[in-house]
Amino acid sequence: MNINKLSVVIITYNEEKNIARCINSVKQIADEIIVVDSHSIDKTKEIAIRLGAKVIEHSFEGHIQQKNFALQQANYSWVLSLDADEALSEKLKNKIQEIKNNPTADGYTMNRLTYYCGRWIKHTGWYPDKKLRLVRKELAQ
């Protein structure tokens, strides 16, 4: 089975400092980018629209609820869910492209790197910090 089409969903609130980096990191693998914004009062929405994302405003009811709402907005059956302060490495983009061409599972975890004061935290249980981020929409929630 070939994924072919991939939706990327990003939840935001006042993320003008992060959203461009996040969106730019997924542009070459995403077939659509949807930003679900919790009524930001900064320039998050304007930046996302300028970069080609579809922006949907939705009041924040909780992290999981917002993620699930974002998932439901996706038009394709494969969805990559990100937070606005996250960005994909070239290596991860290449791996996702491979998965798009030949998926072998219904969901994929990714190791999240956590930075504090500009330094990657590699110890104390902070790495690997595996998160389920790439899923078949109809099997997730």
Predicted regions and their residues:
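Acidic helix N-cap motif at the loop->helix transition within catalytic regions
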Residues: 20, 42-51, 91-92
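A conserved acidic beta->alpha catalytic loop
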Residues: 25, 37-46, 83
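Catalytic metal- and UDP-sugar-binding loop of GT-A-like glycosyltransferases, i.e.
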Residues: 36, 58, 80-84
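Catalytic-site signature of metal-activated, phosphate-bearing donor transferases
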Residues: 68-72, 76-82, 89-141
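Conserved donor nucleotide-binding strand/loop of the catalytic core
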Residues: 31, 45-73
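Short, acidic, metal-binding catalytic loop of nucleotide-sugar glycosyltransferases
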Residues: 24-33
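N-proximal low-complexity "stem/linker" segments adjacent to membrane-targeting elements
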Residues: 1-25
